[in-house]
Each structure stands twice: as structure tokens, then as C-alpha cells.
């Protein structure tokens, strides 16, 4: 199968996908209600889409094409409000977060869709363990070569995205000591990690063709990279975010991506090289493990610094581009919470310290997703 041509898209436009938990309001464990939710949601006119995911206790929502983080928030608000109403009819709740804090993976059931069934046959128990919940952000690129440059420039900021979105400290009722344990499940897949460092579409086509000849890859969907090109949309797709507990944070993260992308296109600040990836896995681990308290190694200079400081410096650097694209409020929110070391993983741990019951933490997270200020 040949690689699809890179389609035209408006540069710097956004699209956001969120994978969400469906939980019972009796015990706040995951509940297999995806099919019922989708049946109800089909009747509601909404922007974007609501679709099934790998197991039947999760769904994915997505926006349409948006021009700003405020437009993302507007669309997510419409979809969220409709989800909440539908869930209330079924006596279930919808929750954000990168992992459910105490579900048992072996109890999950694969959603009845051919691709999910094929993946289950291929990956065995990993498929059920893939009941994890991420946010994906698409950013429009001017052309195919620009998309690859954008992808590899964004790779330097993967630790930012992980730490700012981290919301998966608990797995099977245990505190993993990771802020983002979700990504540990992704690492198990053979085609995860990072894209090859090629900077032209013709080189990327050659790589793709080699991979398809091996029989390992049939389409771009087979790559579980942290960032991958989406030629059918004319975008790159950043896939390392945990699903935040609120749609406000999800929209703010999209605003940060857009501000970075605007800086890259306007200033072409550096040319990515293979050496950028010497510290990639280390930086990624640090962000997953320690969140905003991680260490960041600058790939260009080799300097070590607190990740929090690097995020704050970058937020300042892209502030004028945020202003141009209506993302100043989004970056202001991220700046304030970064300065305090506050991400969703910390919020979840604080609730657990207070409540000593993960079901109650999940209940409060459901209220937070609804828009309650707790």
C-alpha cells in the first residue's frame, strides 16, 4: 500500500481528540456502556464526532477543524454537555484522566469493531491493557515537508506536553509514582516511540515503502509514534497527552501547541537533527515519572535544568504568537499552574490523601469533568 498524498490544510488550524472513561455511578468503576452512549449521542447534532474506542468502557470525542483554542473549548463544551446529559440517562458518568485509578484490565471487553478485534488478536492482553485515555492534538501544516520539520521541532517539547497533561498516577489501585503511567502501556507496542528523523516527504515515502515491504506496516495507523504525520488531514498529530480532567486544560494544551507551531513557521528557529534524539527517551521518562518536577536536558546544548523552568521560559517566548492566535488566556492558565507545580496528577493524589478511597476520587473527577470547580 502506497503512502497517501499529503492533503492541503490551513496552517495552524487545530483539531482535538479526547478518549474518555465511562464509569458506573454506583461504584465508579469502568462500565461497559459505549454502545448505549453512542446510540443516544447519534441523535444529538454536534460539531466533530463521538466514536467507539478499543474497549467498551471508553469513547472518543473529537472537534471539527478549529482556528483557536477558544473555538476548541467551545466545541468541546457542546460535546461535553451532551455527553453528560446522555450519561445521566444511563446512570453512568464521564470522566477524564489518563488511566482509571482502580479498574482491572482483565475485566475489559474489546469493542465489537473489525479493527479492534484484529488488534486484539495481534496484541493479546496488551489490547485490554490499552484501556487508557489520551488527548491527541492535530495542527495544520502548509505542506508535506513543513509537516516533517514541524514534527521534529515539536519533539523537543514532548516532555512539556507530558508533564502539563499528566493525569495517570494510579493503575489498578496502586500509586505508580509516575505522573503519567499511561505512556508505559503505549511503550509496549512494537511501533511506538518516535518517527524517523527525515525532513523531506520524499525521504519519508521511501521509509514508509520499506516498512510496507517488510509486511509489518499496512498504513500510517500502524505507527503508534508520539507524533505522526496525518497526510489525509494535512496535519501532524501529537499523541503523548494524557486526557486532562477538564476540557479547559485540553483546550489550553491545544493553544500551546498552536503557539509553538506559529513560532516555528514564523522564525524557523532551529533545524532538527538525529542528535536531537540522543536525550529524547531520557527526557520523556523524566516527564512521565516526575511531571513538572522533572529534569530537562537541552538536546542542543546538553544543559540540565528543571523542566518547569524550561516550560516557563518557552511560554514567555511564544507569548506574542499566542496573542496573535487568541491563546493568551490558555497560556496564562498553563503558566500559573506550572509555576505552582500543579497538574492533574497532583490533584488526583491530593484528593486521595484527603479521601483515602479511589472510588471517591473518581466521583470527584467526574464532577470536575462536568465543570464543577472542585
Curated annotation (Swiss-Prot):
EC number: 6.3.2.2
Source superkingdom: Bacteria
Catalytic EC class: ligase
Catalytic function, reaction form: L-cysteine + L-glutamate + ATP = gamma-L-glutamyl-L-cysteine + ADP + phosphate + H(+)
InterPro entries named in the record: GCL_type2/YbdK_subfam, GCS2, Gln_synth/guanido_kin_cat_dom, YbdK
GO BP of this protein: modified amino acid biosynthetic process
Gene3D superfamilies according to UniProt: 3.30.590.20
Record's keyword terms, sorted: ATP-binding, Ligase, Nucleotide-binding
Gene Ontology molecular function: any one: glutamate-cysteine ligase activity
Keyword ATP-binding: yes
Functional note: ATP-dependent carboxylate-amine ligase which exhibits weak glutamate--cysteine ligase activity.
Annotated family: Belongs to the glutamate--cysteine ligase type 2 family. YbdK subfamily.
PANTHER family: GLUTAMATE--CYSTEINE LIGASE 2-RELATED (PTHR36510:SF1)
Protein name according to UniProt: Putative glutamate--cysteine ligase 2
Amino acid at each position: 500500500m502506497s503512502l497517501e498524498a499529503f492533503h492541503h490544510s490551513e496552517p495552524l488550524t487545530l483539531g482535538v481528540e479526547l478518549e474518555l472513561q465511562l464509569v458506573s455511578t454506583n461504584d465508579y468503576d469502568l462500565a461497559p456502556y459505549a454502545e448505549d452512549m453512542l446510540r443516544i449521542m447519534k441523535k444529538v447534532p454536534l460539531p466533530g464526532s463521538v466514536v467507539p474506542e478499543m474497549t467498551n468502557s471508553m469513547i472518543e470525542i473529537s472537534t471539527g477543524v478549529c482556528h483557536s483554542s477558544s473555538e476548541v473549548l467551545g466545541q468541546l463544551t457542546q460535546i461535553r454537555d451532551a455527553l453528560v446529559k446522555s450519561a445521566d440517562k444511563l446512570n453512568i458518568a464521564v470522566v477524564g484522566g489518563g488511566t482509571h485509578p482502580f479498574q482491572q484490565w482483565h475485566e475489559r471487553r474489546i469493542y465489537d469493531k473489525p479493527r479492534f478485534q484484529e488488534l486484539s488478536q495481534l496484541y493479546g492482553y496488551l489490547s485490554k491493557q490499552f484501556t487508557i485515555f489520551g488527548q491527541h492534538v492535530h495542527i495544520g501544516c502548509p505542506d508535506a515537508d513543513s509537516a516533517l520539520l514541524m514534527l521534529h521541532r515539536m519533539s523537543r517539547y514532548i516532555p512539556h506536553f507530558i508533564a502539563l497533561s499528566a493525569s495517570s498516577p494510579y493503575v489498578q489501585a496502586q500509586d505508580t509514582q509516575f505522573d503519567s503511567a499511561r505512556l508505559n502501556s503505549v511503550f509496549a507496542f512494537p511501533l511506538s516511540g518516535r518517527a524517523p528523523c527525515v525532513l523531506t516527504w520524499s525521504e519519508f515515502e521511501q521509509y514508509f515503502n520499506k516498512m510496507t515491504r517488510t509486511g509489518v506496516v499496512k498504513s500510517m495507523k500502524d505507527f503508534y509514534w508520539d507524533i505522526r504525520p496525518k497526510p489525509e488531514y494535512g496535519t501532524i498529530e501529537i499523541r503523548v497527552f494524557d486526557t486532562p480532567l477538564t476540557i479547559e486544560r485540553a483546550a489550553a494544551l491545544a493553544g500551546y501547541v498552536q503557539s509553538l507551531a506559529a513560532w516555528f513557521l514564523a522564525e524557523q528557529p532551529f533545524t532538527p537533527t538525529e542528535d536531537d534524539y540522543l536525550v529524547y527517551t531520557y527526557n520523556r521518562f523524566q516527564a512521565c515519572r516526575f511531571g513538572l518536577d522533572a529534569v530537562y536536558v537541552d538536546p542542543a546544548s546538553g544543559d540540565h535544568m528543571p523542566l518547569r523552568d524550561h516550560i516557563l521560559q518557552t511560554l514567555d517566548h511564544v507569548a506574542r504568537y499566542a496573542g496573535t492566535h487568541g491563546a493568551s488566556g490558555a497560556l496564562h492558565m498553563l503558566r500559573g499552574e506550572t509555576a505552582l507545580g500543579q497538574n492533574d496528577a497532583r490533584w488526583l493524589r491530593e484528593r486521595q490523601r484527603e479521601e483515602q478511597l479511589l472510588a471517591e476520587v473518581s466521583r470527584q473527577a467526574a464532577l470536575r469533568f462536568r465543570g464543577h470547580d472542585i
